[in-house]
């Protein structure tokens, strides 16, 4: 079920403070975050986030197409190795 419209989007306070200070300074330095649950807002466009996927930090450059999604959607936590292929018989 989606989040209620009257509540508004969720963004961790510490992350929003970092975003606003980066915008004020004009800094291009990536913001390191573990907050995968935070929603991407229009204020975040043009900022690079290093989003933790449980093992490493994945760089995510936010564009206008990312607005409304969560940061964790752009940093996959699982790697798909593929299914075992059919074995060719010799002979």
From Swiss-Prot:
One of its GO terms (cellular component) is cytoplasm. The keyword Secreted does not apply. Transmembrane segments: none annotated. Pfam families: Ribosomal_S19 (PF00203). SUPFAM superfamilies: Ribosomal protein S19. GO terms for biological process: ribosomal small subunit assembly; translation. InterPro entries: Ribosomal_uS19 (IPR002222), Ribosomal_uS19_bac-type (IPR005732), Ribosomal_uS19_CS (IPR020934), Ribosomal_uS19_SF (IPR023575). Belongs to the universal ribosomal protein uS19 family. Protein S19 forms a complex with S13 that binds strongly to the 16S ribosomal RNA. This is Small ribosomal subunit protein uS19. The gene is rpsS.
């Amino acid at each position: 079920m989606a989040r209620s419209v009257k509540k508004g989007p969720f963004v961790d306070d510490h992350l929003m403070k970092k975003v606003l200070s980066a915008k004020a300074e004009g800094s291009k330095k990536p913001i390191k975050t573990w907050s995968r649950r935070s929603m991407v807002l229009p204020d975040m466009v043009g900022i690079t986030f290093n989003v933790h996927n449980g093992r490493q930090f994945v760089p995510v450059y936010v564009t206008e197409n990312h607005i409304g999604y969560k940061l964790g959607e752009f940093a996959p936590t699982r790697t798909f190795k593929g299914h075992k292929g059919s074995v060719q018989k010799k002979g």
